[in-house]
C-alpha cells in the first residue's frame, strides 16, 4: 500500500472514530452570559492538593484551585459532545443572526462556479450535503460587526468574546497565583477586566475585528486586536501534489485541539470548493482563504487569464459558503513591482507574484486595487473581514524593511480607510523574514500608516539558515512582534520551505506559536497571563509531577519525556527527576533550606526570650556588684540600688 493511501485511510479512520476529547485531568466548563444561549467554553485544569505538613500517615493538605485556560477546540474538546463530521457542528450563532432581522435567505447559491459544482455528478460522492441555504444582507442593510459597533450595539458575539477573554480568572483569589510582573505594553490598553462595551469600542475604532461571516454560524466568536490576547493562525489546505478532504478535516480538528484561534484554507489542488465546505461546516473557529488561489485554478494556473468578473464570482462563492476573512493582495501595484528587481529573493508571496505577473503582462493597474470598492461591497453583505495581504513581504533577511515592503504597507493603510467607509472589518498582514533588530520598526510603521488596524504576521523568521527548524526561527520573531503589538501570529511549521505539513508538523507549529503568543502576553503584562506560569512553578517546586504534565501546553510530550527515564509510578511522586537525581536536585535542596529556615523562624521567639532573660540577669548582677556586693544597706545609704 502506498504511503499516500495509508495517510488517507488513517485520516478516514480518525474522522470515523472522532469524539470529544478532554486534555489530561481537564474538564470543559461553560461560563454563562446574559442570555441562555451565551455559554462560553473554557478548559479547567484540575490540580492535586499541596502537602503542607503533618506526617506520612496523617498529612496536612492544602487544595489548589483549577486553572482556567482559553479553549479553541469547540465541541472537539468536550467528551459529552456527539460529533458527526458528515452533519457538521451545531449553528451556535443562528438565533443571534436571525434576531437582527437584517438578512435574507437566498433561493440557492449565486456563484456560477458553485452552481456548476452542485450540478457536477462527479462531485456527488465527496460533496458535503448542506442543509441550510446561504444568507445575504437585505437591501440597504449592513451586517458587519463593525457596523453594529459603530451604531452602539453590543451584539451577543461581543458579550461572548468579553467572557472568553477574561477566562474566568476573577474566580482565582490565591495571591501566589495572581501575582504578575508589570510588563511593557508599548501603548496598548489592557484593562483588568474585559467588558462587552470595551469589545464594542475596540471594534468600532477599527483596532480589533470579529471575523464571523453570517454563513458560518458554527463558529465560536473570537477577537483579533492588540488590546486582547495574542492569537495564532494555522494554515492547512491541499496542493496539486498531495492531501485529501479527509486529511484536511483531520488537520482542522487537530489544529483546534492544539490551540489554533483561526484556520486558513490555502488549498491549491483538486476539489477546493468541496474541501472548503467540509472545513467550514466542521470548524468552531473562523476560517480564512486567499481567493486568488482558487481563481487561478479556474484559469488552469495562467495568471494572465485572470479577470475581475471571475475573481468576483469566486468572492461570492466563498462568502456564501461562510469564509470569515479574505486575504486580498490589493496593495501590489504596478509601480511597485520594479522595486523588487534588486532583491535577493524577489517576490515570495504566491498571491503577490500572481498579481505582479498579471500587472506586467497587461501593463495595467491591479484589478484588485481598481475594484477594491466592489470587493468591500461584497464583504459588507456577508460580514467577511479583509486581511490585506503583504504580497511584497521580504522572503529573506537581506530584503527586510525595503522600499517595496513599506510602499505596499502605506497603500494598505489607504485601503483600510476605504474598507472602513463600508463598515468592513480589516486587519493588515505583515512579514516575513526580518532580523531581530529590525522587527520593532515593522510594528511602528504598521501602527503609523494603518491607523491601528490589527497586525497579522507570518513569523517573522529571524534567520534564513535553518530549514527544518523554521518553527524555531519564526517563533523568536513572533514572540517579539507579538510583544510589540501584533494581534495575530501565523504559525510556521518545520516543513516551511520544504513541503506540505502533515498532522504532526501542524502540532509542532501550533505549540511553538502558543509559546510565542503566551510569551508576548506575559511581556505586555496582559492581566491574568501569568496565572498558569505561577501554577506550574508552584507544582514544580512541590514535585507535583502529574500537575506539571497537565499544566503544560503539551501534556503528552511532557509526560513522555519524564517517563523515558522514570517510568515507574514512584517516579510521579519522587522529589527529583533524572536530570540531577535525588542528591543534586536544586528544588529539593531549596525545599530543605526553606524547611531549616522555617524551623529557625519558629525557634526564634523562644530564643529571643531566653536571651532577654539572660541579659536581664547579667544587668542585675552588674548592678549588685556596682552597689558594693553587699546583701543589706542602711536606710541612709547613698548607694544606688538595682
Curated annotation (Swiss-Prot):
So what does this thing catalyse? 5-amino-1-(5-phospho-beta-D-ribosyl)imidazole + S-adenosyl-L-methionine = 4-amino-2-methyl-5-(phosphooxymethyl)pyrimidine + CO + 5'-deoxyadenosine + formate + L-methionine + 3 H(+)
Positions that bind [4Fe-4S] cluster: 577, 580, 585
Q: Which organism is it from?
A: Alteromonas mediterranea (strain DSM 17117 / CIP 110805 / LMG 28347 / Deep ecotype)
Q: How is the cofactor bound?
A: Binds 1 [4Fe-4S] cluster per subunit. The cluster is coordinated with 3 cysteines and an exchangeable S-adenosyl-L-methionine.
Q: Which pathway does this polypeptide act in?
A: Cofactor biosynthesis; thiamine diphosphate biosynthesis
Kindly state the subunit structure of this protein.
Homodimer.
Per its UniProt record, what NCBIfam families does this chain match? PRK09284.1, PRK13352.1, thiC
Lineage: superkingdom: Bacteria
Q: Kindly provide the name given to this protein in its UniProt entry.
A: Phosphomethylpyrimidine synthase
EC number(s) recorded for this UniProt protein: 4.1.99.17
Which EC class is this protein assigned?
Answer: lyase
Annotated residues for binding of Zn(2+): 433, 497
Family classification: Belongs to the ThiC family.
Output the GO biological process annotations, alphabetical, semicolon-separated. thiamine biosynthetic process; thiamine diphosphate biosynthetic process
Key words of the record = 4Fe-4S, Iron, Iron-sulfur, Lyase, Metal-binding, S-adenosyl-L-methionine, Thiamine biosynthesis, Zinc
Q: Which cofactor does it need?
A: [4Fe-4S] cluster
Gene Ontology cellular component?
Answer: cytosol
**The organism's taxonomic lineage, starting at the top:** Bacteria, Pseudomonadati, Pseudomonadota, Gammaproteobacteria, Alteromonadales
Q: Which annotated residues bind substrate?
A: 235, 264, 293, 329, 349-351, 390-393, 429, 456
| UniProt keyword Hydrolase present | no
Q: Does the keyword Zinc apply?
A: yes
Stated role? Catalyzes the synthesis of the hydroxymethylpyrimidine phosphate (HMP-P) moiety of thiamine from aminoimidazole ribotide (AIR) in a radical S-adenosyl-L-methionine (SAM)-dependent reaction.
Write out the GO MF terms.
4 iron, 4 sulfur cluster binding; carbon-carbon lyase activity; zinc ion binding
Amino acid at each position: 500500500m502506498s504511503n499516500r493511501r495509508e495517510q488517507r485511510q488513517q485520516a478516514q479512520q480518525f474522522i470515523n472514530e472522532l469524539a470529544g476529547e478532554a486534555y489530561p485531568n481537564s474538564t470543559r466548563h461553560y461560563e454563562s452570559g446574559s442570555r441562555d444561549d451565551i455559554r462560553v467554553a473554557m478548559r479547567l485544569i484540575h490540580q492535586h492538593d499541596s502537602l503542607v505538613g503533618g506526617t506520612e500517615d496523617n498529612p496536612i493538605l492544602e487544595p489548589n484551585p483549577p486553572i482556567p485556560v482559553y479553549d479553541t477546540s469547540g465541541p472537539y474538546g468536550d467528551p459529552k459532545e456527539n460529533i458527526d463530521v458528515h452533519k457538521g457542528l451545531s449553528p451556535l450563532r443562528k438565533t443571534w443572526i436571525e434576531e437582527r432581522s437584517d438578512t435574507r435567505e437566498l433561493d440557492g447559491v449565486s456563484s456560477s462556479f458553485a452552481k456548476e459544482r452542485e450540478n457536477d455528478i462527479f462531485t456527488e460522492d465527496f460533496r458535503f450535503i448542506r442543509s441550510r441555504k446561504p444568507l445575504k444582507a437585505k437591501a440597504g442593510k449592513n451586517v458587519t460587526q463593525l457596523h453594529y459597533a459603530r451604531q452602539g450595539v453590543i451584539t451577543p458575539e461581543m458579550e461572548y468574546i468579553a467572557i472568553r477573554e477574561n477566562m474566568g480568572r476573577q474566580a482565582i483569589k490565591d495571591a501566589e497565583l495572581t501575582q504578575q510582573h508589570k510588563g511593557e505594553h508599548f501603548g496598548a490598553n489592557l484593562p483588568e477586566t474585559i467588558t462587552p462595551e470595551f469589545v464594542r469600542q475596540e471594534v468600532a475604532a477599527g483596532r480589533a475585528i470579529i471575523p464571523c461571516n453570517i454563513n458560518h454560524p458554527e463558529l465560536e466568536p473570537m477577537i483579533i486586536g492588540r488590546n486582547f490576547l495574542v492569537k495564532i493562525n494555522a494554515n492547512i489546505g491541499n496542493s496539486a501534489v498531495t492531501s485529501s478532504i479527509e486529511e484536511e478535516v483531520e488537520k482542522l480538528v487537530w489544529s483546534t485541539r492544539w490551540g489554533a484561534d483561526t484556520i486558513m484554507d490555502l488549498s491549491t489542488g483538486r476539489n477546493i470548493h468541496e474541501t472548503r465546505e467540509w472545513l467550514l461546516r466542521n470548524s468552531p473557529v473562523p476560517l480564512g482563504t486567499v481567493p486568488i488561489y482558487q481563481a487561478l485554478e479556474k484559469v488552469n494556473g495562467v495568471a494572465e487569464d485572470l479577470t475581475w468578473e471571475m475573481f468576483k464570482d469566486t468572492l461570492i462563492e466563498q462568502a456564501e459558503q461562510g469564509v470569515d476573512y479574505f486575504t486580498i493582495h490589493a496593495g501590489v501595484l504596478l509601480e511597485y513591482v520594479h522595486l523588487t528587481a534588486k532583491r535577493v529573493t524577489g517576490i515570495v508571496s504566491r498571491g503577490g507574484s500572481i498579481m505582479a505577473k498579471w500587472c506586467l503582462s497587461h501593463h495595467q493597474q491591479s484589478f484588485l486595487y481598481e475594484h477594491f470598492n466592489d470587493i468591500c461591497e461584497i464583504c459588507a453583505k456577508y460580514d467577511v473581514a479583509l486581511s490585506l495581504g503583504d504580497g511584497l513581504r521580504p522572503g529573506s533577511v537581506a530584503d527586510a524593511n525595503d522600499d517595496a515592503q513599506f510602499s505596499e504597507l502605506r497603500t494598505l493603510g489607504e485601503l483600510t480607510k476605504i474598507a472602513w467607509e463600508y463598515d468592513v472589518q480589516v486587519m493588515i498582514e505583515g512579514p516575513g523574514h526580518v532580523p531581530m533588530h529590525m522587527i520593532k520598526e515593522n510594528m511602528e510603521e504598521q501602527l503609523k500608516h494603518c491607523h491601528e488596524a490589527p497586525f497579522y504576521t507570518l513569523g517573522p523568521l529571524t534567520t534564513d539558515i535553518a530549514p527544518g527548524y523554521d518553527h524555531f526561527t519564526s517563533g523568536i520573531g513572533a514572540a517579539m512582534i507579538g510583544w510589540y503589538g501584533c494581534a495575530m501570529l501565523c504559525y510556521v511549521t518545520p516543513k516551511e520551505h520544504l513541503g506540505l505539513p502533515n498532522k504532526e508538523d501542524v502540532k509542532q507549529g501550533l505549540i511553538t506559536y502558543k509559546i510565542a503568543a503566551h510569551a508576548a502576553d506575559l511581556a505586555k503584562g496582559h492581566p491574568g497571563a501569568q496565572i498558569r506560569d505561577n501554577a506550574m512553578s508552584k507544582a514544580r517546586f512541590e514535585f507535583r509531577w502529574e500537575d506539571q504534565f497537565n499544566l503544560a501546553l503539551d501534556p503528552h510530550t511532557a509526560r513522555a519525556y519524564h517517563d523515558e527515564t522514570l517510568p515507574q509510578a514512584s517516579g510521579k511522586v519522587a522529589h527529583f527527576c533524572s536530570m540531577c537525581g535525588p542528591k543534586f536536585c536544586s528544588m529539593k535542596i531549596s525545599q530543605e533550606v526553606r524547611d531549616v529556615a522555617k524551623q529557625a523562624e519558629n525557634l526564634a521567639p523562644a530564643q529571643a526570650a531566653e536571651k532577654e532573660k539572660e541579659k536581664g540577669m547579667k544587668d542585675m548582677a552588674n548592678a549588685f556588684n556596682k552597689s558594693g556586693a553587699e546583701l543589706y544597706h542602711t536606710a541612709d545609704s547613698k548607694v544606688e540600688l538595682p
